[in-house]
Regions:
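C-terminal motif of bacterial Sec signal peptides marking the signal peptidase cleavage site
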Residues: 16-17
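Boundary/entry segment of secreted carbohydrate-active catalytic domains
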Residues: 21-63, 71, 78
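Noncatalytic carbohydrate-binding groove/subsite architecture in carbohydrate-active enzymes
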Residues: 172-317, 324
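Aromatic/acidic polysaccharide-binding cleft in carbohydrate-active enzymes
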Residues: 271-380, 393-401
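Solvent-exposed beta-hairpin/edge-strand motifs
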Residues: 434-449
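C-terminal beta-strand-rich structural cap/linker in extracellular carbohydrate-active enzymes
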Residues: 455-471
Length: 471
């Protein structure tokens, strides 16, 4: 496969040698002066406990090694309290805490910003209870103050409160009230007051719950205008392929960003290939793969995570995030082993969205699921080469159809420029940086990673390829 790809690149180079190069210039015009970075949803394997398959030291070391390559700049970590601090009769902070401690120890040691939170209250009837607010904040303080996990910077009190699947069922007034109550409780703890703020509204872009007075845009607008306790704005997005590739998704993000005067991040992001009629071919393939699958029913999964094109779609989506002025995005999600649908514990219907399944052999009797999937590589490059504190910059140049790009100046003064060519034709690129190319390299992904020096900014961008120029 590698030899075939090299041959195709050589042929592409000959075919485009007489084609005028696409000039792309990195300017000093700033889109975002302090990008927070790209990251991943990494939840603490709550269901491994009832599955009777605790992660081994070997599993954890594998996770750490893969994450060290990725260098996520932030992690979104959400818990289900019935698996952790809620016993069914009361509250116990240290209950089943081994996994979340290992997860947060990693983030603390690597300086990774953590957005921590709860999917829902322990029971839906507890959603407004004083006991839950006190216990939830006490558990947060236990993590931050007593265990030293100061990497936790933001707190999500309800996951996707606009949704009809949430205990809030789109009730904005109730959510607003609860934000105030949680903030008042957090202010009682010195380790939390002024150190951890609330992230919200955590609403899903392009979704509207008929039971709610607001759609997602309305949720964000109402939060900006009426919920001053929120320290960082947080949304979720699951667009389709046409929506992203057409540029419409980026325009939606720009419209949302124009409403806010603080950083806004995507707490969850991924693709749903069955929401747009234009993606019908992908939808048909999706449901074909779901049929008879041994460990998912298709109710909450993405069967395309195994494909090379997903390794192009995900960084392409990130380019829309970065170029729109948003400040971060966390991919949903790191590992299939983190959740079953509805957190029911049913191994025949897991949320198959990950870069691998670390319990593929132990729980699912399929060791091949533990192998790294293609999109891990391109997402990792977008994490490690656009670190926190980078300036996202405007590009000048007329990019060809089916090619997208984003650029940044890093905190060390160097530059990173990423490209995705999701079309069927190769293109010669003539890239101009504000500095010389000494020490820079070109990394590409097309069914595998390749790396070589780039001395003058000129290179061929093959069809169906991700590329990044960086130090």
């Amino acid at each position: 496969m590698k030899a075939r790809y090299i041959f195709l690149v050589m042929v592409a180079g000959l075919l485009v040698s007489c084609t005028k190069a696409v000039k792309v210039t990195v300017t000093q015009e700033v889109i975002n002066p302090c990008y927070l970075g790209n990251g991943i949803e990494w939840d603490p394997y709550d269901e491994a406990i009832p599955w009777g398959a605790a992660l081994s030291d070997e599993d954890w070391n594998t996770l750490y090694e893969r994450l060290d390559y990725m260098q996520p700049q932030y992690v979104r970590c959400m818990i289900n309290s019935p698996f952790t601090y809620y016993t069914g009769k009361g509250f116990e902070d240290g209950r089943n805490s081994e996994n979340i401690k290992k997860l947060l120890e990693y983030c603390q040691s690597r300086g990774v910003m953590v957005v921590y939170g709860e999917y829902n209250p322990p029971a839906w009837e507890m959603k407004g209870s004083k006991e839950w607010v006190e216990a939830s904040v006490r558990h947060l303080n236990w993590l931050v103050a007593e265990n030293g996990f100061t990497c936790i910077k933001h707190f999500v009190i309800f996951n996707e409160p606009d949704g009809n699947w949430a205990s809030t069922n789109g009730d904005f007034a109730f959510w607003k009230e609860m934000v105030g109550r949680f903030q008042a409780e957090m202010d009682k703890y010195p380790a939390l007051k002024g150190q951890v703020d609330i992230a919200g509204p955590d609403a899903v872009i392009d979704y509207a719950n008929p039971a709610s007075e607001y759609d997602a845009e309305g949720w964000l607008k109402a939060t900006v205008e009426n919920v001053p306790e929120v320290g960082i704005y947080d949304m979720h997005a699951y667009p389709g392929q046409r929506y992203v590739r057409s540029g419409e998704f980026e325009e939606t993000l720009k419209k949302l960003k124009a409403m806010v005067d603080k950083p806004v991040i995507l707490g969850e992001v991924g693709f749903k290939y069955f929401s747009d009629p234009a993606d019908s071919t992908l939808a048909q393939e999706y449901w074909k793969r779901v049929e008879g699958h041994p460990f998912t029913k298709g109710s909450d999964c993405n069967m395309m995570v195994y494909d090379d094109f997903y390794a192009l779609d995900m960084p392409l989506l990130l380019m829309s995030v970065m170029n729109s002025g948003f400040s971060a995005a966390a991919a949903w999600m790191l590992d299939d082993a983190m959740h079953s649908n509805g957190d029911s514990g049913r191994i025949e219907d897991i949320k198959l969205w990950g870069m691998w399944n670390i319990l593929g052999a132990e729980v699912f009797e399929d060791p091949s699921q533990e192998e790294v999937r293609p999109w891990y590589y391109t997402w990792s490059l977008m994490c490690r080469h656009f670190p926190a504190g980078s300036k996202i910059l405007e590009l000048e140049g007329d990019l060809p159809e089916n090619v997208a790009s984003t650029a940044a100046q890093l905190p060390d003064g160097s530059y990173s420029v990423a490209f995705v060519n999701y079309g069927s034709e190769s293109h010669p690129i003539d890239l101009k940086l504000p500095v010389s190319f000494e020490g820079y390299s070109l990394q590409t992904y097309h069914s595998g990673l390749e790396k070589k020096p780039v001395s003058n900014g000129r290179f061929v961008l093959p069809a169906q390829t991700f590329a990044i120029v960086s130090k």
